């Protein structure tokens, strides 16, 4: 009986060791978004999805129209300019834009479309990032952030698609 208990415990520990990192990566993570005045305007959720990392955005209080939205390279969001978030997340050193043949940055997304009531509810999937701690991982040392810009992203111009000022930001953290 004791031999069985030790064997069972060994199997459990082996499975936990083998599945542990994947289990940690598989968790949904909520990103609290704030505007340039430091007020909360909504949230985003990242989660593993078939083909990459899913991003679900739910925000209010923005100007109607299209807005650039990107993962940025630093896990800081200091209002009002959010310059502390650094540039776009770009571990491969590519050019900006989904329509750029020399791109895109790992942090690039299609535009976020805000309705006439100032709210946006959108979902995207990025095959260029992971929920790991290195390489293309959003949980790497120094962190990352999600930034919404004032203007539409033209999807081709370096470094940020002419998407204008940073109007909302959220730190990506577990």
Language model: regions and residue ranges:
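Bacterial N-terminal signal peptides that target proteins for export
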Residues: 1-11
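N-terminal leader/targeting pre-sequences
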Residues: 14-66, 71-174
